[in-house]
Amino acid sequence: MKFRFPIFIIDEDYRSENASGLGIRALSEAIEAEGVEVIGVTSYGDLSSFAQQQSRASAFILSIDDEEFDVDSPEDVASAIKNLRMFIGELRFRNADIPIYLYGETRTSEHIPNDILRELHGFIHM
């Protein structure tokens, strides 16, 4: 019997043909080459139901785009941080120990508040 505990990658560009989509799919392919199942999705959807349904996940990689943290649009920054905080909270409520990684540009990591960074297992720099 084979147990499958995939890594979930959440990126709005996962299926896009732009540079971001190509980059996240390259990461996905590299993980799969190591023998780990990867499931790519394009949005968080309903946060609580997604976290509950994905109880078999072994880890989450959450992609954050630099555009979401454009300092000229503080409302967008606040919204992106709120959504990220809520999703991580739902994951931690379901499983306090599941590894969570952020994937994004190095400069984007500067905008992530410390309370979110403490919940992460790492930041994958693109």
What is each PLM-predicted segment?
Residues 40-42, 77, 101-126:
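Output/docking surface of receiver
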Residues 9-13, 60-70:
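Short loop/turn segments at strand-loop or loop-helix junctions that form parts
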Residues 27, 80-87:
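A general structural detector for well-ordered alpha-helical segments in enzyme core domains, enriched
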Residues 14-22, 68-82:
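Short, flexible/disordered intra-domain loops and linkers
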Residues 60, 84-114:
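A short, hydrophobic beta-strand element within the central beta-sheet of small alpha/beta folds
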